[in-house]
Amino acid sequence: MNRLKEKYIKEVTPSLVEKFNYSSVMQTPKVDKIVINMGVGDAVSNAKNLDKAVEELALITGQKPLITKAKKSIAGFRLREGMPIGAKVTLRGERMYEFLDKLVTVSLPRVRDFHGVSKKAFDGRGNYTLGIKEQLIFPEVDYDLVDKVRGMDIVIVTTANTDEESRELLAQLGMPFQK
């Protein structure tokens, strides 16, 4: 079993039950899934850029990404409906816990001038969104093979009903929030 999942079961669950006075252990919030999205805007003019982004996302997550397509045509961006413009991965179960563990312990501390992640990025339903400016913070990405610095959005979906519960869950799992 993954280190973070073990910590969740043995330490986080009992402390959350105690803090929020749940009547059952099953009421405790848990991480449901993690969605990583990489929008590749320049894929409109050069489709090869998307292949590189897909390759990097597969390296980072250990799972084959889904290529996302444009929902609407936008003339200003020379974009047609159905054109491939990005990639996304949905992680659940073991891979999700492995990715979260790696993100919290290895990748986020590698960000330049890192003072913790924002406490304000919750959506009101207990989900947390995190933007990353460069893919180089992940140890799997080889610096020499990177053609262009790309960012990504990471959405951590929890079963929590409020932001407060979700914040407490993520903080206990090791998410470095700003002081």
From Swiss-Prot:
The keyword Secreted does not apply. This is Large ribosomal subunit protein uL5. One of its GO terms (molecular function) is tRNA binding. This is one of the proteins that bind and probably mediate the attachment of the 5S RNA into the large ribosomal subunit, where it forms part of the central protuberance. In the 70S ribosome it contacts protein S13 of the 30S subunit (bridge B1b), connecting the 2 subunits; this bridge is implicated in subunit movement. Contacts the P site tRNA; the 5S rRNA and some of its associated proteins might help stabilize positioning of ribosome-bound tRNAs. Pfam families: Ribosomal_L5 (PF00281), Ribosomal_L5_C (PF00673). The gene is rplE. It comes from Enterococcus faecalis (strain ATCC 700802 / V583). It comes from the Bacteria. InterPro entries: Ribosomal_uL5 (IPR002132), Ribosomal_uL5_bac-type (IPR020930), Ribosomal_uL5_C (IPR031309), Ribosomal_uL5_CS (IPR020929), Ribosomal_uL5_dom_sf (IPR022803), Ribosomal_uL5_N (IPR031310). Keywords: Ribonucleoprotein, Ribosomal protein, RNA-binding, rRNA-binding, tRNA-binding. The keyword rRNA-binding applies. GO terms for cellular component: ribonucleoprotein complex; ribosome. Part of the 50S ribosomal subunit; part of the 5S rRNA/L5/L18/L25 subcomplex. Contacts the 5S rRNA and the P site tRNA. Forms a bridge to the 30S subunit in the 70S ribosome. One of its GO terms (biological process) is translation. PROSITE patterns: RIBOSOMAL_L5. Coiled coil: none annotated. Belongs to the universal ribosomal protein uL5 family.
